[in-house]
From Swiss-Prot:
UniProt keyword terms in alphabetical order: Repeat, TPR repeat
Name this polypeptide is given: Tetratricopeptide repeat protein 13
TPR repeats: 143-176, 216-248, 249-282, 284-316, 317-350, 352-384, 386-418
Organism: Homo sapiens (Human)
PROSITE patterns, A to Z: TPR, TPR_REGION
InterPro entries per record: TPR-like_helical_dom_sf, TPR_rpt
Domain of life: Eukaryota
Amino acid sequence: MAPAGCCCCCCFWGGAVAAAGAARRVLLLLLLGVLSAGLRPGALATEHYSPLSLLKQELQHRQQQEAPAGGGGCSPQSGDWGDQYSAECGESSFLNFHDSDCEPKGSSPCDSLLSLNTEKILSQAKSIAEQKRFPFATDNDSTNEELAIAYVLIGSGLYDEAIRHFSTMLQEEPDLVSAIYGRGIAYGKKGLHDIKNAELALFELSRVITLEPDRPEVFEQRAEILSPLGRINEAVNDLTKAIQLQPSARLYRHRGTLYFISEDYATAHEDFQQSLELNKNQPIAMLYKGLTFFHRGLLKEAIESFKEALKQKVDFIDAYKSLGQAYRELGNFEAATESFQKALLLNQNHVQTLQLRGMMLYHHGSLQEALKNFKRCLQLEPYNEVCQYMKGLSHVAMGQFYEGIKAQTKVMLNDPLPGQKASPEYLKVKYLREYSRYLHAHLDTPLTEYNIDVDLPGSFKDHWAKNLPFLIEDYEEQPGLQPHIKDVLHQNFESYKPEVQELICVADRLGSLMQYETPGFLPNKRIHRAMGLAALEVMQAVQRTWTNSKVRMNGKTRLMQWRDMFDIAVKWRRIADPDQPVLWLDQMPARSLSRGFNNHINLIRGQVINMRYLEYFEKILHFIKDRILVYHGANNPKGLLEVREALEKVHKVEDLLPIMKQFNTKTKDGFTVNTKVPSLKDQGKEYDGFTITITGDKVGNILFSVETQTTEERTQLYHAEIDALYKDLTAKGKVLILSSEFGEADAVCNLILSLVYYFYNLMPLSRGSSVIAYSVIVGALMASGKEVAGKIPKGKLVDFEAMTAPGSEAFSKVAKSWMNLKSISPSYKTLPSVSETFPTLRSMIEVLNTDSSPRCLKKL
């Protein structure tokens, strides 16, 4: 592979002119890099890998595209590799030309492409032969010259000619190891996409191993052929043998890469660490090490490794990109933005950085800025499915349905090939298109006159919520876009009346109080505004209810119920991000309800730790221990003391498995523990909470998860509890309106928190339950005269606080400890009605789109 800025040369052999593709293959770098099977082991695939992306699929995709081809090239990317590994050249004493036809990296390209004639090839071959700078050189000068010619042919891209040359030599000397080896390389270079080439390459390399079993470079070369074919375990075995014969930094790095592909991040980390101990100046190995941390959820350790890689190579684009993504996962928007920007300053056309930055901006609520990144991404890569999907989503979220649906249709037309797995974007896009059409048709219909949960077909909702392929029998598509319904236009903040501007600023502030300060949760200003407006609308609706006013829902006027209160927040959460199906699970088809919906969260999967929930691992561990002791107290009282002593030594969830297997033969490969939720309505009665599952055969290969199964029967029990609490809340709220007694306000506060405690444990929505419920808490408390002034503490998740609390009183106590409740400002009473100010979908999208930052900052 040639350094960036290197020119490439044509060559003649036997009167035949190499094709234009061969003309771009550089003799020097191919002999240094591609012939590394014997000249510098490992370069064929190891040095040809692009740096590992943050997503394993990206790594595998690139490996499949690049490694099988094996050809050199003068791309800037391959140049990066040559530069990154310059520190490793001392690992091998193999061929190192100095009389190259290439300019050094960074200089201008050659003025013209030179042709290598027969004389020059022979001259190069003679030089190689004299110094025996090729694999398995012999003691015969004439034989060495013939072998060197064949290797130069490989370097010139003339693989068939090289194979014929080696074959002629093998007819005379069947066990000539260098010829067998070279022919294997040539077959591999022809392209592993042709399985025949792969089989012949492996056959030849296996012959070499039989004849020369103690040469590590041959095992590595065979691993380089095996890995692109998906035969990872065999490749790892070959690299292990090579390491046993002659350890090197490159070999450990190469094997670590394969462990990474296999998702064995801990073992991959060990190999990258070993590689760095042998040669510390390896920015790519340091990047890989950081990625093993990243994929295990160890974000701070990953960031340190990425920074170290940048110390070694200041212009390392992939390290900046990875650093940006790690900061994004931590929720540090400013640091992530800075890192992505540095990557793009080095290469403004770096597609994956544009894609990742665009997605971060979308989830930060900066849709216009996100859209610019996706458009630029598509200019560079027109068939980039992620950027195309996100472009369509961004347009739809801003109310630009024509452009949005056009982009969605492009994704829909990109059908996967037979046997190819459909991308997540392809699976989601038809749901988004149908939902987009529905939203467009209702842009100007009063929100009180229609209901998404009723209008959308049951099977559509069921499949969408479960992220299933769009295979719905007898589905009738939503009507196409109606020309008379125009897209949403941009609304300047200054165009709103002063009192509406004040309403928006208050909403922004309230919404920011709902932000989780936990890894994995990026601040989203669009969600903040939406849920702040939801809280204010809940406040106003609850106050009207407590003064005996009725509400208009679905075209009917009636007294507000608890679901109406939550529906206010649901509508705002839905429109803030139309990508996510926020649907009531009890409104699903009867068949789906009977089976139940599982709200599943992996806390540990294999070696991957979900950092969002790390704060709760110890709490869940203590709960599991208590349940185990209760179980053994009832079923194995004699062995209870032994079990207790064993459990006292357990400090990590994953260490529970061997203990359970030791004391319970029924455990086999896992066990489950169920939580219970005590009833307030019926003292002594308990409802099913969530299920904790731990499965696996050893530490490092476990699944630690929690799930809530929302069945029809369970839903009815929780609804009865919430109905009773809401009835009590309404009665006490009406008393509170007429009274200023502190005790009444405190009782109302406890009822609000208790009601939401059961909502959290029920998990009645397909998405968004957490922020929806918290906005209801904030809004209902304001209706009672109390304002939430405190932020949610770092590491705390309100839904998990409710789910892991022993009862509603405990949840109320912990929630009030951080809410810092104070008397509501009188100015809230003068705010305009949210439902009347934003009565349609169009007006809701307009207010979410508008930029209030300069004015609202002044008001605060």
